[in-house]
Amino acid sequence: MKELDQILEKCAEEIDPLSHEIAERIRKLKNLPKDEMFLEYLRIIDFTSTTKIPWRKKNYILIILWKYGEKIERLLYSRLEHFGRANVPKRYFRLVDGKILSMLFLVFILFPAFTSHIWSFRLGYEEIQVGKEITFNENLCEYRTAWLYDFKASMVCTIKYGYGKVNIRLNSTNPMEAGVEVQRFISQIPYDYARLESGFSYIQTPRETIGRRIGVCSDFAILTAQVLLDNNVSPVYIIHTLFKGDITGGHATAALFINGTLWIFDWGSAPVTFSEYLDTIDRLWEVREVRVYRLTESSIVLDRVYKGEPESDAWRYVYTLTMLIGIFIIKRREWLWI
């Protein structure tokens, strides 16, 4: 067959510069019957793969033999596929596809949502009885900047020493009724979200809060405590809650002990028990510590502290590990080098 001889000659010509011996063996195949010639061609490939020659040269020869072997096979045996390339659908490389997006949704949405409910402040905290009085030099209270950003000093200067005091008369001295009345009053004052977002959590006196008609939680807590104490509702409690990663100073609200239950009177909400308050705030933020201050007209005492158990952040690294493993599993067939 003339076409077959041409294929063998071209193959020999390409291999000759690399190995004259192999090229001559290929030329001799022209004189053999087609079946014997094909088997001998396969033997030449096997001989080349096992011969000790430089690997780069060996690879070049094998590539040439494979290329022309495919042509010979198609010419002689259309049904054989020793050399023929498998008919595999072409895969297009896509960095992001539906599977990747689904995995990212699981890793960064569902998984964090689930794990965030595993740890809860209510499920593990330590109650520490403190009973330590909070003090601050009265002479320093005359300098507003000395306690502008200090919540504890602000309580001492405004509640104990009366700086920035307001005179508001309530309609009742009943603790619950008085607490509800003050709560409704402070809830009518707009919340200063701009100051909260800015991170500059300075403390206002009750007079400043009333005069400016705006404030944040610490301002409303101090105002509520001062008004209640001024109306002979005593003692008043201030609950200071600290959150993980919060730079604004946490959240403060006033409270009263009524019939053995601590009731919270927070801005913009109805009265709730301390337990209900913790349940609500624990769902919104990661609570790290709750400080309970006991206030009278003559003293500010850190009564007790509820301290959350330390939470390990080691499990958060599962995000990255899961993502890398997921990408490897999903994309391994497209990334041919894996």
From Swiss-Prot:
It is found in: Membrane. Keywords: Membrane, Transmembrane, Transmembrane helix. InterPro entries: Transglutaminase-like_domain. It is a single-pass membrane protein. The chain crosses the membrane at residues 100-120. The keyword DNA-binding does not apply. The keyword Protease does not apply. One of its GO terms (cellular component) is membrane. Pfam families: DUF553. Its main location: membrane. Belongs to the UPF0252 family. This is UPF0252 protein PF1496.
